[in-house]
Design a protein with these regions (language model features):
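Short alpha-helical segment of the dimerization/phosphotransfer core of two-component systems
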Residues: 59, 113-121
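Short beta-strand/loop element within the Bergerat-fold HATPase_c
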Residues: 205-217
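Acidic ATP/Mg2+-coordinating residue in the GHKL
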Residues: 225
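Short helix-loop "hinge" at the ATP-lid/N-box region of the Bergerat-fold HATPase_c
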Residues: 198-199
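Short conserved segment of the HATPase_c
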Residues: 230-243
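Conserved glycine-rich
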Residues: 269-270
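Conserved catalytic submotifs in the C-terminal HATPase_c
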Residues: 142-145, 164, 169-179
Length: 289
């Protein structure tokens, strides 16, 4: 009877070993026998948990690999367009022979256009480097008390000329003492991106309003515009990288909203996008305490 028990346990160990080999060689389907008691049952349970964990890690790595491949394709596309245009401009400048007034004027115009394209590529590289820092965790976000009113005013400064040109008025409503804990510089970049998005979707001008409040649980910032709103088709994609809505007027990169979401996510916050009943878009930011 003792010998029979030894043979049974050896057979179970051999079966478990065979299953582990199949797993190691990458078989998709595997079946670990159930052992009711003893060391083999404990070992079998640990192997099962290890396999599940390794499969989950492999799936996550594959998702990250696919994401990186998509990112590289998007970046290549974003760079290819201005570089192709610059190549064509260089070719056309070479064909402009002579030193007449008309030739000089055309060369100056095309050189100006090339400079604009170079600036665009430079801006894209800067934004991508910031996104890379956020993704890799190397971006150092400070945690300090931020006045929400000061943050909004600072965030709107770079957009003052654009708002004037497009007839957009900034409306503020909130308590001067309301605040949250976060990084002022990164938070300002996120808010600027959301405000810029609103301006780009307001073809006929209007009010770009920011309201805020602080509760015992979170601080809230609400940004609304009087633009065309977000279509049902676009709403699920609004925070995706390189996604540009059909109603945007300017040729941006489609990274601003994704960056804004990433910045606040790093600060224990969330951003939600929705449409207003009276028209236009609404972005609600919550930063938890």
């Amino acid at each position: 009877m003792f010998a029979s028990e030894i043979c049974r346990r050896e057979a179970q160990a051999s079966s478990l070993s065979d299953e582990i080999d199949r797993i190691l060689y990458g078989e998709e389907h595997w079946n670990l026998d159930e052992y009711s008691e003893g060391e083999l049952a404990i070992l079998q349970d640990k192997v099962r948990k290890l396999v599940i964990r390794l499969r989950e890690q492999a799936d996550q790595l594959q998702k990250e690999k696919n994401f990186q491949a998509e990112m590289m394709a998007d970046i290549s596309h974003q760079l290819k367009t201005p570089l192709t245009a610059m190549r064509l401009m260089i070719s056309s400048i070479r064909k402009l022979e002579g030193s007449g007034e008309d030739e000089v004027r055309q060369r100056a115009r095309r050189l100006t256009e090339m400079q604009q394209l170079v600036d665009r590529v430079d801006s894209l590289v800067v934004v991508l480097l910031k996104m890379a820092k956020l993704d890799s965790g190397t971006a150092i976000l400070q945690k300090e008390k931020i006045s929400i009113k000061d943050l909004i005013l600072h965030s709107a400064e770079p957009l003052a000329i654009s708002m004037d040109l497009h007839g957009v008025k900034l409306c503020l409503n909130g308590n001067d003492t309301d605040s949250f804990q976060g990084d002022f510089g990164w938070s300002a970049e996120a808010i600027t991106n959301i405000l810029k998005n609103g301006i780009e979707h307001m073809e006929n001008g209007g009010n770009l309003c920011v309201s805020w409040r602080e509760t015992s649980v979170y601080s809230e910032i609400v940004i609304t515009d009087e633009g065309s709103g977000i279509s049902d088709e676009e709403l699920p994609h609004i925070f995706e990288r390189f996604y540009r809505g059909k109603t945007a007027r300017h040729s941006g990169f489609g990274i601003g909203m994704a960056m804004a979401q990433s910045i606040f996510a790093k600060q224990n916050g969330t951003i939600k996008a929705q449409n207003r009943e009276e028209g236009g878009a609404k972005f609600v930011i919550h930063v938890r305490k």
